[in-house]
Amino acid sequence: MSAILQGAGAATALSPFNSIDSNKLVAPSRSSLSVRSKRYIVAGSDSKSFGSSLVARRSEPLIPNAVTTKADTAASSTSSKPGHELLLFEALQEGLEEEMDRDPHVCVMGEDVGHYGGSYKVTKGLADKFGDLRVLDTPICENAFTGMGIGAAMTGLRPVIEGMNMGFLLLAFNQISNNCGMLHYTSGGQFTIPVVIRGPGGVGRQLGAEHSQRLESYFQSIPGIQMVACSTPYNAKGLMKAAIRSENPVILFEHVLLYNLKESIPDEEYICNLEEAEMVRPGEHITILTYSRMRYHVMQAAKTLVNKGYDPEVIDIRSLKPFDLYTIGNSVKKTHRVLIVEECMRTGGIGASLTAAINENFHDYLDAPVMCLSSQDVPTPYAGTLEEWTVVQPAQIVTAVEQLCQ
């Protein structure tokens, strides 16, 4: 991977089928694991030499004990100051605005990103502040304006390209694959492509098949591209800022049902590491790896699991490419069991790639096969009850953990 990469109003609330009230939902605080001494980003690395020390000896077959830790327990916030509350889409906007203030080379382009403010208001107010050249409304032609953004990056700008819906970016797949991802390599290093491609996706509230795409499975095979998925206002802003500053092309995945999440974020400047997972809930019995909206389904299931005597460790992987196998590996060495929960399709999804990486690097530390819960391999139905059936629900997560921990 390192040989290919160039350098190192609001939306709807959570699904009505999810019992979490998004208007009251406050994203948990964040913390990473210990300082990295070694990072695994290439499949096939020697898991025996992992890190500076082993985390735990192999466990005996798990017998659930009473667990008193709250299911939503997380490490303390990275900020010592009260900060200010923002919805997730507002956090994205704030991060983008700060980077445009900081660097005059940062620009925005896409459909209705100008005075309309974007389909989910992530670019609201930017055209008034920075003008119509730095916040450019484009024709409805994804292939054209994506190519324009890549060309602008080749000449020294740092474009942020918005897809009104991630599904529409299929029309720009040639530009994203053959140009965005590969030009640094095919030009012999003459060009860097510091482009951010972002937009809403995921299964929404009866948006139909074409507007419910999860394109991470499509883009993960493109060499030279990094992919991250935000899940809280804090990491949405931090990942946005980090992606803009990166010399690599970065795709930032945003979920349509998370735009209204509210969280207090620091007043001081911060960025998130593009290749770092987030420890959401420490635990001992099983590692649950997830990202984006499924983070909240997992945390809902964790409350039930705690009441049943299980102590799950929940990690939001955030970096979809490359995987943070340091954080993941430390957790696997401690719990010896892995459940992956994703909204991506099962066939060829992120979960399949993550399963392969874990088996190749940490097979000797597993006491049970890696299990992956994914969306059904069907077009997303419009009918609400059928739409619910296609994606992983908290009850399925509870059942899977019980099976793995027998």
Curated annotation (Swiss-Prot):
Annotated K(+) binding sites: 195, 243-244, 248
For this record, an example GO cellular component is: chloroplast envelope
Enzyme Commission code(s) on record: 1.2.4.1
List locations, semicolon-separated: Plastid, Chloroplast
Transit peptide, residue positions per record = 1-70
Q: Which Pfam families match?
A: Transket_pyr, Transketolase_C
Gene3D superfamilies on file: 3.40.50.920, 3.40.50.970
- List ligand-binding residues for thiamine diphosphate: 142
Look up keyword Metal-binding and say if it applies: yes
Q: Which UniProt keywords apply?
A: Chloroplast, Metal-binding, Oxidoreductase, Plastid, Potassium, Pyruvate, Thiamine pyrophosphate, Transit peptide
Q: Which cofactor does it need?
A: thiamine diphosphate
The main location is plastid
* Catalytic reaction annotation: N(6)-[(R)-lipoyl]-L-lysyl-[protein] + pyruvate + H(+) = N(6)-[(R)-S(8)-acetyldihydrolipoyl]-L-lysyl-[protein] + CO2
Plastid listed as a keyword: yes
Q: Output the NCBIfam families linked to this UniProt entry.
A: PRK09212.1
- Please report the name of this protein according to its UniProt entry: Pyruvate dehydrogenase E1 component subunit beta-3, chloroplastic
